């Protein structure tokens, strides 16, 4: 076997690894790209909606029996919230709908939320709407690897205030 044939798989591996590191560091140094991509994504489904009046944050929801956590785009304001299952594309610049979850977009008026529970660490929120419980897990970074701690804190504060009213 010719040893030069081993160079090609090794070269592909090195280029792929370098691209992965580049995307990770690119996300750490940016802020706001997820919000822009999220607003563009929402415009596809609701073209008449003024997306500028909504704040955007990312969480994870379990949609299946297999307990796979799917990233979900949360667009909210004090009176309503939208949940969109999303994944980022390979370049990390756009959001797409995961295959098989096209019908899981949800619009929830805040007044229809019957109960809200937030963990002390602020990494998980559960709420009940029409008898159906939804649990959202939050992480420090979103799919674009941007720090979203402040946005999560603002979201949980808004939901806690809505629960008090």
Which role does the model predict for each range below?
Residues 107-110, 137, 164-165:
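An amphipathic alpha-helical interaction surface
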Residues 131-151:
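Canonical phosphoinositide-binding patch of PH/PH-like domains
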Residues 146-164:
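Short amphipathic C-terminal alpha-helix that caps PH/PH-like domains
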Residues 66, 77-125:
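Phosphoinositide-binding peripheral membrane targeting modules
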């Amino acid at each position: 076997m010719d040893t030069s044939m081993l160079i090609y798989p090794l070269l592909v591996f090195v280029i792929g690894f370098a691209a992965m590191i580049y995307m990770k560091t690119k996300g750490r140094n940016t802020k706001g790209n997820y919000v822009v991509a999220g607003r563009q994504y929402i415009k596809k489904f609701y073209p008449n909606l003024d997306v500028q009046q909504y704040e955007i944050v990312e969480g994870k929801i379990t949609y299946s029996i297999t307990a796979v956590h799917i990233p979900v785009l949360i667009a909210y304001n004090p009176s309503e919230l939208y949940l969109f299952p999303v994944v980022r594309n390979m370049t990390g610049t756009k959001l797409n709908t995961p295959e098989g979850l096209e019908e899981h977009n949800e619009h929830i008026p805040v007044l229809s939320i019957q109960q809200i529970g937030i963990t002390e660490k602020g990494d998980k929120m559960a709420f009940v709407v029409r008898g159906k419980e939804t649990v959202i897990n939050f992480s420090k970074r979103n799919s674009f690897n941007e720090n979203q701690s402040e946005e999560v804190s603002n979201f949980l504060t808004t939901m806690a205030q809505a629960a008090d009213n």
